[in-house]
Amino acid sequence: MIDEKNQAKIEHAVREILSAVGEDPDRPGLVETPARVARMYAEVFATKTAAPFDNYKLFKVEHPTEMVLLKDIPFYSMCEHHLLPFFGTVQVAYVPQHEQVIGLSKIPRLIDYCSQQPNVQERLTVSIATELQRILDPAGIAVSITARHMCMEMRGVSKPGVHTESSYYSGQFKTDLDLKREFLQRIAK
């Protein structure tokens, strides 16, 4: 959580930005905006002040499946270049080993943890896989992200609706082309 000193710094900076773009930060519609933005940053950048992700439980499974797949997990993050949102869906698959699996709800929580900081999509993709590898040590991981970036839609090239895709594969997903193909076919449905 952002402490009071840094909260005040953010509020001051937002007032300065509003003034610099020709707004009156004391007018009725904007007077509370600096505090709102500071609270919003505390929320969307929560990982920067959080402890390492440890909100998970592993379960022993005598006969684990070949692949565990979670599809269409929504996420949002903030582009580190423009501090504008990017958002979309994540597909995560892993091949269990050591007869253990992770609680299913923990993967979306892990995605939230990795995305709540200034980011680029490519690093977010790898971060999700790296954290899952650290926690679970599976035989392979596949992560695919499809996202829309407001820094491309609202400014610069101004192309609404463009989707950016990124992926990361490790272990069996990298060496077993049939497994990788199965992952890609299943996420395409």
From Swiss-Prot:
Cross-referenced Gene3D superfamilies, in alphabetical order?
Answer: 1.10.286.10, 3.30.1130.10
Q: Does the keyword Metal-binding apply?
A: yes
According to the UniProt entry, what is the EC number of this protein? 3.5.4.16
Q: In which pathway does it act?
A: Cofactor biosynthesis; 7,8-dihydroneopterin triphosphate biosynthesis; 7,8-dihydroneopterin triphosphate from GTP: step 1/1
Q: Where does Zn(2+) bind?
A: 79, 82, 151
Record InterPro entries: GTP-CH-I_C/QueF, GTP-CH-I_N, GTP_CycHdrlase_I, GTP_CycHdrlase_I_CS, GTP_CycHdrlase_I_dom
Any one GO CC term of this protein is: cytoplasm
Keywords annotated in UniProt: GTP-binding, Hydrolase, Metal-binding, Nucleotide-binding, One-carbon metabolism, Zinc
Q: Does the keyword Zinc apply?
A: yes
Q: Which GO terms describe its molecular function?
A: GTP binding; GTP cyclohydrolase I activity; zinc ion binding
Superkingdom of origin organism: Bacteria
- GO biological process entries: one-carbon metabolic process; tetrahydrobiopterin biosynthetic process; tetrahydrofolate biosynthetic process
**Which reaction(s) does its UniProt entry say it catalyses?**
GTP + H2O = 7,8-dihydroneopterin 3'-triphosphate + formate + H(+)
What the entry lists under NCBIfam families is as follows: folE (TIGR00063), PRK09347.1-2 (NF006825), PRK09347.1-3 (NF006826)
Assembly with partners or alone:
Toroid-shaped homodecamer, composed of two pentamers of five dimers.
The UniProt family comment states: Belongs to the GTP cyclohydrolase I family.
Q: What protein am I looking at?
A: GTP cyclohydrolase 1
Q: State the species of origin.
A: Lactiplantibacillus plantarum (strain ATCC BAA-793 / NCIMB 8826 / WCFS1)
Q: According to the entry, what is the taxonomic lineage of the organism?
A: Bacteria, Bacillati, Bacillota, Bacilli, Lactobacillales
Q: Which gene encodes it?
A: folE
